[in-house]
């Protein structure tokens, strides 16, 4: 089946689902090459239908929060649901207590809410008073990786062209495997760079 990622905010008792995303894990075009931490993603996923959403809300999302609380593990924060869409319905592949990368890069820019208010509601246990809203558009993220990733790759190579994105609305450059060198130039410092 298809994999879909869904991020959520949790305050210990209430869960608020963000919009869906779908990432591409293979290092090369055409779903070829080794698995990676993610080479790109888009949101929303066309495979995360209203029917899938209803199923997950009924059997997965709130049930997860309730089960954690029942076990004495009340959770506040972010839950990332890695789902597999099968003929028998959605199945949970993984849970992560963090934002997903690169899924977050296409989900949060579409969110209309003030994220600080949402985080405060998670901490205060008032998430039930928040309704998440998202732009009615799509977002795409393409990861720029060092040659050779996910195996061997060079570090310390200068990155050029970042000024191209200054003053561009709705364009973002998210840094991952980068750093400033001794001269103050942004250089590569990992496999998934931007």
Regions inferred by a protein language model and the residue ranges of each:
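Active-site "cap" helix and flanking loop/linker of ATP-utilizing ligase/carboxylase catalytic domains
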Residues: 57-79, 96-168, 176, 181
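Internal helix-turn-beta structural module
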Residues: 170-194
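Short, well-ordered beta-strand elements within core beta-sheets of diverse protein domains
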Residues: 41-44, 142-143, 193-194
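Hydrophobic alpha-helical transmembrane segments
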Residues: 17, 167-171
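A structural signal for short secondary-structure junctions
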Residues: 87, 134-136, 166-167, 186-192
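Internal nucleotide-binding/catalytic subdomain
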Residues: 1-107
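Hydrophobic side chains in beta-strands
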Residues: 8, 85, 144-145, 175
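Short clusters of hydrophobic/aromatic residues that line enzyme substrate/ligand-binding pockets
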Residues: 39-42, 159-162, 173
């Amino acid at each position: 089946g298809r994999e879909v990622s869904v991020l959520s905010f949790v305050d210990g008792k209430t869960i608020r689902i963000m919009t869906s995303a779908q990432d591409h894990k293979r290092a090369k075009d055409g779903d070829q090459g080794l698995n990676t931490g993610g080479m790109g993603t888009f949101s929303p996923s066309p495979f995360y239908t209203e029917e899938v959403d209803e199923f997950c809300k009924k059997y997965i999302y709130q049930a997860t929060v309730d089960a954690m609380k029942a076990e004495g593990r009340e959770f506040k924060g972010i839950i990332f649901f890695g789902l597999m869409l099968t003929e028998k319905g959605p199945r949970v592949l993984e849970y992560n207590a963090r934002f997903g990368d690169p899924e977050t890069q296409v989900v949060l820019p579409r969110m209309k809410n003030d994220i600080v208010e949402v985080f405060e509601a998670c901490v205060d246990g008032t998430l039930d008073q928040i309704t998440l809203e998202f732009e009615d558009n799509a977002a795409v993220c393409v990861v720029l990786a060092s040659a050779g990733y996910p195996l061997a790759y060079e570090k310390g190579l200068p990155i050029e062209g970042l000024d191209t994105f200054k003053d561009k609305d709705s364009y973002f450059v998210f840094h991952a495997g980068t750093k400033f060198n001794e001269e103050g130039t942004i250089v590569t410092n990992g496999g998934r760079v931007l």
